Amino acid sequence: MATSPEHISMALFCDFENVALGVRDANYDKFDIKRVLERLLLKGSIVVKKSYCDWERYKGFKSTMHEANFELIEIPHVRQSGKNSADIRLVVDALDLCYTKSHVNTFVIISGDSDFSPLVSKLRENAKHVIGVGVKNSTSDLLIANCDEFIFYDDLVRESERVAARREARNPRDGQP
């Protein structure tokens, strides 16, 4: 997409449980939304942030997500239909925004779930740029292929570890005043 960063308006939609489980399975400490936001802000402005989950089950993350100004969409955990209602709600909200807010030209789907591939296709059909964010080992190849761009959380973790190591090398603390 040839849009300059000052003209990029992004809407973020986070399937929180999916990404939190992916981070856990990859043996990272815990999902850090700040890493994702720092990378995305290099691309443009973020005008909408929504995160979907049964927040009763993920209470420990609520304050961090609130601090990052996410609207937390409460999706009670009911497994009667077999279909994740967080996924459905996320799709409905993303399409609603696509059709009603023309200034939003970039959609970010934070999930590794292949169920979002039809959403990505529909957004692209409507001339929206789509960025996916997910954990490498728990992200569908189909989702990766459908997005215009995909950011692996694993790369963000490695980058922050490299930055921390460089900082530590410049300012060693072993016994020096």
What do the PLM-derived regions correspond to, one by one?
Residues Y58-K62, V135-L143:
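Short, glycine/polar-rich helix-capping loops at beta-to-alpha or helix-loop-helix junctions
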Residues T100, N105-S111, D115-G134:
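Active-site histidine-anchored catalytic micro-motif
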Residues T139-A164:
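Contiguous mid-protein beta-loop-alpha structural module that forms a pocket-lining wall or clamp
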Residues M1-Y99, L119-R124, H129:
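Domain-level signal for Mg2+-assisted phosphodiester chemistry and nucleotide/NA-binding surfaces
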Residues L72, F107, V130, F150-I151:
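Short, well-ordered beta-strand core segments
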Residues P76-S81, G134-S138, D155-E159:
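Short, acidic/turn-prone active-site loops that include or flank metal/cofactor-
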Residues A86-D93, A145-N146, A164-R170:
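Short, surface-exposed amphipathic charged segments that create phosphate/polyanion-binding patches used
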